[in-house]
């Protein structure tokens, strides 16, 4: 299991790591936590304009490494290696001769995903983001997913069901999104073969990647993305890692099978917002998810919604005009620093 995280995940990390170890610890050979130590300059992934909170959180995080490694078997922390030599190794494996950028056009994580996956050094890599939650708690899902990838040569990825199962199928943002997936079947139960993959959670067949794909293409972001990236001081070479991997599936006719598996199965849940009230409620929320105490309104939806936790306060803070204001502040901060440096 390979978990991507960064210092600003600190408020929830211990609770979500313990949850992941209960869900997957007995199903995997080892667990690598990949910590991105390079803060983005702008966008929704940054900490604050001077990166003070980011670096302070990193020092606190580093103090946790030995504590958590002593608590769990076969757990290790690895900070993302941005050295020129390691970047060449990662670039050669995933891109061939092209150099991999540190960040995506929007300042989001990019290189850290691929460096972590490669460092896992396994034929099958179970990758996930640090904040993901899981219900069903099947202890056989990983073995079933590997068997499925071995059986179906039209798949590059397998993933848990996106959201708790609903008799009417997928809901939330997937409701009616017929372009994104085809309904399928795994061991007699409904499954969904997606033409997309989320970097939040997947099991990847590394041998099939090299045999069927070889290397990834870095499709140039569209002009509006490149302009925004330039204005905010981000690299403009790559779309998000998720988009790059999804376009790869489509180009090569491969898929990502989302399925629950045997028994109570396994499904994923994604928290759309992070803030103190949510982090305070997280231990109780994790307990509910693990016990299967899920309201009907949450079923079929992969994002935690208000039926399970009330995010209305945070949604108001993420209103469009406030997001635009934050981007303008990012722009002013970045170019003020550039002008001072010159």
List each language-model region with its residue ranges:
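Active-site-proximal specificity loops/subdomain of glycosyltransferases
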Residues: 37-121
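A conserved hydrophobic helix/loop-capping motif in glycosyltransferases and polysaccharide synthases
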Residues: 1-9, 34-36
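The conserved acidic donor/metal-binding loop of glycosyltransferases
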Residues: 129-133
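C-terminal catalytic/acceptor-binding lobe
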Residues: 9-12, 16, 212-342
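Well-ordered, non-membrane alpha-helical segments in soluble/globular domains
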Residues: 10-20, 49-65, 106-114, 139-147, ...
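Short, acidic, metal-binding catalytic loop of nucleotide-sugar glycosyltransferases
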Residues: 16-30, 46-50, 67-71
């Amino acid at each position: 299991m390979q978990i991507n995280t960064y210092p600003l995940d600190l408020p929830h990390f211990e609770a979500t790591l313990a949850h992941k170890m209960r869900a997957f610890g007995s199903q995997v050979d080892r667990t690598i936590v990949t910590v991105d130590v390079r803060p983005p300059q702008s966008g929704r992934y940054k900490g604050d304009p001077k990166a003070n909170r980011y670096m302070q959180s990193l020092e606190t995080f580093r103090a946790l490494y030995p504590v958590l490694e002593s608590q769990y078997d076969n757990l290790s922390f690895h900070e993302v290696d941005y050295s020129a030599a390691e970047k060449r190794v990662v670039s050669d494996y995933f891109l061939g001769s092209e150099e991999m950028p540190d960040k995506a056009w929007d300042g989001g994580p990019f290189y850290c995903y691929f460096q972590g996956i490669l460092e896992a050094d396994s034929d099958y890599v179970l990758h996930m983001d640090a904040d993901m939650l899981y219900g069903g708690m099947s202890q056989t899902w990983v073995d079933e997913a590997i068997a499925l990838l071995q059986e179906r040569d039209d798949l590059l990825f397998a993933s848990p069901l996106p959201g708790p199962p609903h008799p009417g199928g997928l809901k939330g943002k997937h409701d009616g999104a017929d372009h994104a997936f085809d309904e399928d079947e795994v061991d007699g139960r409904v499954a969904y073969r997606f033409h997309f993959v989320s970097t939040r959670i997947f099991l990847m067949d590394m041998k099939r990647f090299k045999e069927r794909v070889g290397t990834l293409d870095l499709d140039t972001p569209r002009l509006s993305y490149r302009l925004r990236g330039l204005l905010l001081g981000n690299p403009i070479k790559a779309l998000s890692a998720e988009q790059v991997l999804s376009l790869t599936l489509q180009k090569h006719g491969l898929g990502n099978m989302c399925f629950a598996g045997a028994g109570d199965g396994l499904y994923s849940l994604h928290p759309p917002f992070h803030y103190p009230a949510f982090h305070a409620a997280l231990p109780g929320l994790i307990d509910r998810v693990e016990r299967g105490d899920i309201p009907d309104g949450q079923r079929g939806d992969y994002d935690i919604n208000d039926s399970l936790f009330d995010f209305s306060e945070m949604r108001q803070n993420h209103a469009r005009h406030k997001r635009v204001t934050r981007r303008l502040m990012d722009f002013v901060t970045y170019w003020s620093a550039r002008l001072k440096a010159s």
